[in-house]
């Protein structure tokens, strides 16, 4: 019996950076909820971006945002996992040294960049992802007390190669550095992640792990796979993820997750 479903967004429910989702997801998720099954989007996106994507049903969802560093509902923040304050300045400064990298820092209610409003990063986050984002001269001018994530962006899809000097350094023992797609390296607290947030949600809802499913397509989803009763991915996912998953659905282009949700709906009892 399945009582809780969580899913990554980009590369799993929608193509990377898509500003909208197949509206049939709203219908199927609502039908699952009517049978007592809870749905939780789980993404590297900000809460504001996720809320926009799921606007017609957002008031009925849990949200795991910013790569597992904040768990909330529409009404209330339930938990946050901020980056240790002493790491933020040196981490940003290291990111600035890397060729072609733009730095972005993420707080619970706002995101900050320093690339200019005509820069590729700002335009992507503002126009496509619908972030509440502000361009400022220096992201280090923002208070450090609730920084959830430091993100490094490379517009030419070479994030792993460009950031290798950072990921191979001592920084790997201070923060988690997770690749999300081919443009992003997400730096979060060591005790943060999608898996940690998904596990806490299960605890708060008193739902055992074996009654959960998690859908994801990238390396930042691996921690959530280990916290799920069943792990699922799409055929367009990275090979490492396909090998780790219990279920491989059709590609994101062919709404593989939507098909799996319909299968779950078909076999679910009328109400849990």
Region locations from a protein language model:
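Active-site phosphate-binding/coordination module
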Residues: 20-122
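Conserved acidic, metal-coordinating active-site core of Asp-based
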Residues: 94, 100-215, 219-224
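Asp-based phosphoryl-transfer active-site loop
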Residues: 3-18, 225
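Mg2+-dependent phosphoryl-transfer enzymes with acidic/Ser/Thr/Gly-rich catalytic loops
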Residues: 1-4, 22, 186-272
